[in-house]
């Protein structure tokens, strides 16, 4: 499979989806979401999921494929995208679009990911020991893997221990990179902090206007307030509002603040990859410059 792949990445609220929609129509391409929350059904407004009208314009994939109670891993994502790319007719490039850096990295770098299903009972037992002891245990069985994980990063520590206890092999020995052979163009969107902050404020207000509060309320009634996805950006703040812990104005301000912090972390992640070509979506010739780059890539 040598069909070119065009990646559109960057921080949240930089206009990735809008650009992808325009380019996909010009190129007669499909759009593959690289967003870890858009895979879940019913989480629509708070994840800025493409509307049904937008999905009617261009075929979208890896959206609405899981129940909110299901676990969907990076390995699952990699498997599905790889199969999709292999089955796509070699007529035009596919567009991989989103801000979940690890999803994108799993495709463009060809990460080798341990196929170990989550072990709830094991995790519960490890969590009871505390992060300090878990990290010490990891350092004993896989010092190389522990060196790559921050001592306070409970999620990655537990995952590394989980992989070791299930397979008997340290996670560091099960990882690696096998880059794909097809050509890849990576386009990154990055605007000034002031412009991004304004877009974040506008998008937060738009989500509230579209019915984010009702969406969260419905999800809480159906799945309960302990659903892990309800602790993610945009949903956690509205949940606290619905629980009477803050006013709606406070929830809105919290979403804006947390989105800004999240965007900063995303920017740091993506800026570490030299192969990404960066564009400012607020510049006058933004679309023309992106299109010229794509034409040169496809020539």
From Swiss-Prot:
It catalyses: adenosine(37) in tRNA + dimethylallyl diphosphate = N(6)-dimethylallyladenosine(37) in tRNA + diphosphate. The record marks 100 as: Interaction with substrate tRNA. ATP binds at residues 10-17. Pfam families: IPPT. SUPFAM superfamilies: P-loop containing nucleoside triphosphate hydrolases (SSF52540). It is an enzyme of class 2 (transferase). The keyword Signal does not apply. Substrate binds at residues 12-17. Residues 35-38 are annotated as: Interaction with substrate tRNA. Keywords: ATP-binding, Magnesium, Nucleotide-binding, Transferase, tRNA processing. Its EC number is 2.5.1.75. The keyword Kinase does not apply. Catalyzes the transfer of a dimethylallyl group onto the adenine at position 37 in tRNAs that read codons beginning with uridine, leading to the formation of N6-(dimethylallyl)adenosine (i(6)A). Belongs to the IPP transferase family. Monomer. This is tRNA dimethylallyltransferase.
């Amino acid at each position: 499979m040598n069909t070119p792949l065009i990646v559109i990445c960057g921080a949240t609220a930089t206009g990735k989806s809008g650009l992808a929609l325009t380019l996909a129509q010009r190129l007669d391409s499909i759009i593959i979401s690289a967003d870890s929350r858009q895979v879940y059904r019913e989480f629509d407004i708070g994840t800025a999921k493409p509307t049904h009208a937008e999905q009617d314009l261009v075929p979208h994939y890896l959206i609405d494929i899981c129940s909110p109670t299901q676990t969907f891993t990076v390995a699952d994502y990699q498997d599905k995208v790889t199969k999709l790319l292999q089955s796509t007719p070699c007529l035009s490039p596919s567009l991989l679009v989103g801000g979940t850096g690890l999803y994108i990295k799993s495709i463009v770098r060809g990460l080798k990911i341990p196929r170990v299903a989550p072990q709830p009972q094991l995790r519960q037992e490890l969590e009871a020991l505390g992060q300090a002891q878990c990290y010490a245990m990891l350092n004993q069985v896989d010092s190389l893997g522990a060196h790559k994980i921050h001592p306070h990063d409970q999620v990655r520590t537990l995952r590394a221990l989980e992989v070791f206890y299930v397979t008997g092999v340290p996670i560091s020995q099960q990882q690696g990179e096998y880059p794909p052979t097809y050509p890849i163009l990576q386009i990154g969107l990055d605007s000034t902090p002031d412009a991004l902050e304004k877009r974040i404020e506008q998008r937060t207000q738009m989500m509230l206007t579209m019915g984010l509060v009702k969406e969260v309320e419905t999800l809480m009634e159906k799945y309960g307030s302990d659903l892990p996805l309800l602790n993610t950006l945009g949903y956690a703040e509205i949940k606290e509002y619905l629980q009477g812990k803050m006013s709606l104005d406070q929830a809105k301000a919290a979403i804006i603040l947390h989105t800004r912090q999240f965007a900063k972390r995303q920017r740091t992640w993506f800026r570490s990859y030299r192969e990404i070509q960066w564009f400012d979506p607020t510049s006058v010739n933004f679309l023309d410059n992106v299109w010229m780059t794509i034409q040169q890539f496809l020539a």
